[in-house]
């Protein structure tokens, strides 16, 4: 993913709600399943890591992204953004490389 595409996705993520919350249980199979379902439906999701989580925000985002075959777009504070293109019907069209 290019920096231009990443910047485009960050702009789209500004208006998203946090639909994924990771708490003291850390990254579990249920959290990964929720992320997978949300990415299939939306392609771009925003999540929050609560202060009680045992891992860092970057670690949580990378772990979830690896388990659901997504990309980490951004990590700011306790919030992270993940993107995975829908295989059949993409809703988000990324800008091309020039």
Which positions does each model-derived feature cover?
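Positively charged, polar, low-complexity stretches
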Residues: 1-98
């Amino acid at each position: 993913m290019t920096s231009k595409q990443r910047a485009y996705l960050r702009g789209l993520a500004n208006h998203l709600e946090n639909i994924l919350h990771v708490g003291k249980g850390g990254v579990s199979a249920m959290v990964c399943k929720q992320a997978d379902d949300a990415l299939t439906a939306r392609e771009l999701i925003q999540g929050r890591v609560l202060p009680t989580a045992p891992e860092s925000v970057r670690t949580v985002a990378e772990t979830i992204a690896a388990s659901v075959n997504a990309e980490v777009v951004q990590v700011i504070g306790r919030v992270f953004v993940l993107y995975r293109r829908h295989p059949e019907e993409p809703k988000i069209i990324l800008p091309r490389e020039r």
